[in-house]
Amino acid sequence: MNYKVLKNGELLRVYSCKVYPKPYNSTEHMEYVMFNVDDREEIVIESETEIKSAVIRPLSAGISFEISFGKIILSVDRPVKLSVEINGSSNNNLMIFAYKEEFIGPTHNYIKITQDEYKTGTLLIEKDNTTVYIEEGATLYGNIIAKNCNNITICGRGRVCMERYTYEMRKNFARSIDIINCKNVTIKGIIIDDSNDWSMRITGCDDVNISDVKIFGCRGNSDGIDICGSRNVTVSDIFTRVWDDSFVVKALDTGNCENIIFKNSVLWNDFARPMEVGVELRADKVRNIKFENIDIIHSDTGYPLMGIHHGDHAEVSDIVFDNIRIEDTPGAQLFDIRIADSVWNRDNKMGDIRNITFSNIKYLGTDNNDILLSNSRIEGFSEEHNIRNVNFHNININGKYALTPKELGLNVYEFVDGISVTADNLKNERTVLESEIVMQDDFKPDNGFYKGTVKVILHNKSDVAMNGMAAFAISPKNTEKEQSFEYNIDPNESQSYEFNLKLQAGKYVFYLKNNKNEIENTFLYSELPMIVSENINDCPKYQFVNYYNTKCAEVRIAVKDNELIIMNDSEKTTEFLLYTA
């Protein structure tokens, strides 16, 4: 274990689970601790890796800390789910799960798995009024299935883990928790670890309450919680770190899906979507679905953060995303709503989408990643199967409220009607400078680098003069720093500003920063190919920098006699993994 954690001077047990970091098809271990919080508890964290800096997510938790003599010291006085991340990276983080009390459930038909006890196989619930209690430290290696039962409870602080079951065993060991055609279901407190498919599926059920569940999924299709064709379901106080989607609503021929709420949760997606309605929506109605008070702390592969994807016959309506905070999500779309055919759909007839609300959404970004790299999208299917009445209210992107689809980074395509973008106490006639970022000249190779000029053009189409300070910025940060400039533009006039750049090969986004939030959001994407020659000693040194501003050792790259040569000038042994596509 990398971490040692003390609560009020008492050593805590540190657990470990598999997660999917990067690159593709790999796994690593993430460490976590759990403890009861009665009052203000002092937590001291030590790491085998030297702690130079730290961040504690979600930022909305407002947890203050100090680093003293290489240790992180913080206080916790309430139930929280926190990611402690050191030295500017989310790799090698520590999760903290603090809870108030343990729920042991009703004691009729009581199945108890005690501490340090390990059971294997499928635990099948076949009777009404059954409770499965998994004590902290206990593990069920397998899955839990309940069919056609009323009043069932699954609770405790222990694990349901499928690490012993391979992909080929999915026929019998797919989902860790599978609840089918049941009523009055409570699932509370447990940990789901390394599911072979969706971590938890609720299908054809009524009156379900899921709370304080921690889900770790490192495999393909390891969704967090899928609510399928069910009614009156509350999902709250959840943590997910999964390969696939975190919170999902579907309909799989088990009736309408309605009155579903996901709330007060922390989501970390290593590959796919944090919140999704779809794609399979085989029901007459999918309605009254709400996602509220949710923190997305990481999601970095470009998938939509909030999506509705529809290819079946359902009428999808009254979907709300409210009070969502977004932190580290480089490349992701904020919103994606589409009606389209897909490989997952079976209905011959298409449906429609009505009355969708996104409100109080706050995109925070990170120090090195504070812009949206992908535009959002809304697209219907036909005149008959269309999308109507989509409202965006109080959408804050890096401190600036969007008042137009363009400011929102929203592309609106065919068969869409009734889009509104508003914000409290702001009017659509707010004065904003229109902006352009263009290549003045093509970037030319120069001694292993590229040199070129980027032009910024600001247009003042208002009837008042506008002035202030702005900055031309590049992500990822590489050889160039932000360049500040002053603007003073008369009504109906434009000004241009040129920036001479020297860049290494790589992919870049050029964008503008403005503290007054009066310059519209715009960015320019550019890709500069690597320069390769035969003589490696003549090649430039490449410093690899990713979107997190993580830097690797410098290397030289050459191609000679159909061989790829990679050289590091350092005398130290260098390990690397090469991927080709």
Where are these regions (language model features)?
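Structural beta-strand segments of beta-rich domains
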Residues: 41, 450-456, 562-564
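Extracellular/periplasmic carbohydrate-active domains that bind, remodel
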Residues: 1-438, 463-464, 487-490
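Intrinsically disordered, low-complexity Pro/Gly/Ser/Thr-rich segments with frequent PxxP/GP/PP motifs
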Residues: 478-505, 581
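Short acidic, flexible loop segments centered on an aromatic residue
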Residues: 464-477, 571-580
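Short, solvent-exposed loop/linker segments at the N-terminal edge
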Residues: 35-37, 442-450, 556-559
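Low-complexity, Pro/Ser/Thr- and charge-rich linker/hinge segments at domain boundaries
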Residues: 98-115, 527-547
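Terminal connector regions
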Residues: 503-543
